[in-house]
Amino acid sequence: MSETYTVRSFKGKSPVIPKSCTVFENCSIYGNVILGENCVIMPGTVIRAESGSVIIGENTNIQDMCCIHTDTYEGADVIIGSNVTVGHRALLHACTVEDGALIGMGAIVLNGAKVEKCAMVSAGALVTQNSVIPEGKLAVGVPAKVRRDVNSAELKDMDDTIEEYTQLASDYFEK
């Protein structure tokens, strides 16, 4: 794990980062953030939890330059399940992303929105406030609209991405 990232407590709440996680350089993790085992947090990511919590499940990868943030009112948490991929430069704000989902590069998921299990949000999509992307569906566009089911090849690619980022993190920090 890199030693050049920032971890900061906020109002007595400190991030919890298991030793099995890999956090790259130039990441900032503030407040009530709890990472699950074997998470990979790529360079430049900011995770902030001042009012609520950010909880990230195991084996989840958060790619370069993502922003994950609670809102300013109590209970405006970010919950990200296990085996989730959050693509480069995605923004997650006070939302829920369930197990096995994929958030594409540059996508935005706003307050109260929910991306259900094994759903896929395409690159650049905007999941608007309080909307739901149902389990196993692909959503695209601004605003994001469900287009179809996620197919078996895409589900396999989503699983492969988890394995690839875990291996990538390991390769970077080989001794």
Region spans (language model):
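Glycine-rich hexapeptide-repeat left-handed beta-helix
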Residues: 1-12, 50, 58, 64-67, ...
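A positional/architectural concept
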Residues: 12, 16-61, 65-72
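Short proline/glycine- and basic residue-enriched helix-capping loop/turn segments at helix->loop/beta transitions
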Residues: 85
